[in-house]
Amino acid sequence: MNKRDYMNTSVQEPPLDYSFRSIHVIQDLVNEEPRTGLRPLKRSKSGKSLTQSLWLNNNVLNDLRDFNQVASQLLEHPENLAWIDLSFNDLTSIDPVLTTFFNLSVLYLHGNSIQHLGEVNKLAVLPRLRSLTLHGNPMEEEKGYRQYVLCTLPHITTFDFSGVTKADRTTAEVWKRMNIKPKKARIKQNTL
């Protein structure tokens, strides 16, 4: 199967599902059997999964150390990951490793322990990100939570399982003008 055919078929493939496995560290995935659904996972000749979805929700992960290496061991084309579900874990930050998956369009991070709203800035480099969840994290309590996320990630169409409307975008822009100070341009002084 060539890469183009893979891209066309793997979107409909079932996810590689490690949810509800009490996984503490990413490396444990290598020795863990994924959950099975109604449709079996397709595998490459090398035995790796042919899917673009990885579900790690409802575990006890507190970091994503070695995520890239493990994804490469489990998936035939980890660079094509389009959906990662890390909801209901113990993550305290958005790990920069997630920003290396440029095809990521769905990212679930709800129900974790992410404190700081500024963590969202890391996701701005993901050009295809369209659906994001962050509710149930301490950051949700920060003033302007929804507006900040929509300003930082203007290309998302669904946030916390709610569609992003034109009114949401307008409100976010007004909020941005009122709350985010523009960076001042530095003026170089002539040192003659």
From Swiss-Prot:
LRRCT domain residues: 137-175
GO cellular component: axoneme
Short name of one Pfam family: LRR_9
Repeat region (LRR), residues: 49-71, 80-101, 103-124
Entry-linked InterPro entries: Leu-rich_rpt, LRR_dom_sf
Residue ranges of coiled coil: none
Keywords: Cytoplasm, Leucine-rich repeat, Repeat
Subcellular locations according to the entry: Cytoplasm
Misc: LRRC51 and TOMT were originally considered as alternative reading frames, LRTOMT1 and LRTOMT2 of the same LRTOMT gene in primates.
Name the UniProt record assigns to this protein: Leucine-rich repeat-containing protein 51
